Swiss-Prot record:
Binds RNA. Pfam families: KH_1. GO terms for biological process: chromatin organization; mRNA transport; regulation of translation. RNA-binding protein involved in the correct localization of transcripts in the cell. RNA localization is a widespread mechanism for achieving localized protein synthesis. Involved in structural and functional organization of telomeric chromatin and regulates silencing at the HMR locus. It is found in: Cytoplasm; Cytoplasm, P-body; Nucleus; Chromosome, Telomere. This is Heterogeneous nuclear rnp K-like protein 2. The gene is HEK2. Its main location: cytoplasm. Disulfide bonds: none annotated.
């Protein structure tokens, strides 16, 4: 495990499948209790909600203790010799492919490489990536791991998955640095947190893309994202904005909801806000 010591309390959340959760808990809760005691952290897994295909592991304590505990979790999951699962719930499928024989010469070493799905708020993901990817590149080179962030938000939230692949000790060491990065960039209180998602919600979702000219995007988002956040709450939808403009210099607002009516309402409100902003600017001329 990493040797750096940090005493400030940190909290990390990890996305796990039902099968992974069972392995982490262990018979009569013995495995998770052992991790809890050896790392001196608070660690637990969310209740198994009916219809949900995932659970969330939460761990809090010192940066080093949390990193060690999560490294131990990766080690426990590596002991499963069965073939990797393919999940119908897409966020559970790993983004990174398994390491190839050309990357790791020793077959026994390959078995010790694991993957971690760290849940991070969207605003903090950019802090991990850094300017032009400089920070994420530094993490990869320093710790000998692979790190990638999901492009999409987790359903009904403003959280994304930061996936880390490597040896358990290397992942733990990387987590210490990530904890420092996140401590310097606190998560905004208004961002919606992810909770285990039911399969029926995912399968029955409705999505609509709305192209918005780049020059109006800031106005539609509002200060600190408050305008689009209000739209989300009122219509009970998820709204994701593309990072880069398309060839027509538009950014795409992707609206997702559990039914056609809520998505249509969000689309109508968004376009009405656009027309209002256009009119406001024309009146200024």
């Amino acid at each position: 495990m990493a040797e750096v010591e940090h005493q400030d309390t940190v909290n990390h959340r990890v996305l796990v499948s039902l099968k992974e959760a069972a392995r982490i808990i262990g018979a009569q809760g013995m495995t998770i209790q052992k991790i809890r005691e050896s790392s001196k952290v608070k660690i637990g897994i969310s209740p198994h909600e009916r219809g949900c295909s995932d659970r969330i592991l939460s761990c809090s304590g010192s940066a080093q203790g949390v990193a060690n505990a999560i490294g131990d979790v990766v080690e426990v999951l590596n002991q499963d010799d069965s073939e990797p699962e393919t999940h119908s719930y897409k966020p559970l499928n790993f983004i990174l492919p398994a390491p190839s024989a050309t990357e790791i010469q020793d077959p026994e070493s390959v078995k010790r490489i694991g993957n971690l799905r760290l849940i991070v708020s969207n605003s903090q993901v950019s802090s991990i990536i850094g300017t032009q990817g400089s920070r994420i590149k530094s993490l990869i080179e320093k710790h000998g791991v692979k790190v990638v962030a999901s492009k999409n938000f987790l359903p009904d939230s403003q959280d994304r998955v930061v996936e880390i692949q490597g040896f358990p000790g290397a992942i733990a060491s990387c987590l210490v640095d990530i904890s420092e990065i996140l401590a310097a960039e606190p998560k905004p209180s208004h961002e919606k947190q992810y909770y285990p998602h039911t399969k029926s919600q995912e399968e029955g979702s409705v999505t609509k893309d709305v192209a918005i000219p780049v020059e109006y995007v800031g106005a539609l988002l509002g200060r600190g994202g408050n305008r689009v956040s209000s739209l989300r709450k009122y219509t009970k939808t998820k709204v994701i904005v593309s990072d880069e403009p398309d060839e027509e210099n538009n950014r795409v607002f992707t609206i997702t909801g559990n039914n056609q009516n809520s998505v249509k309402l969000a689309e109508t409100m968004l376009l009405k806000n656009l027309e209002t902003e256009k009119q406001r600017r024309e009146d200024k001329v």
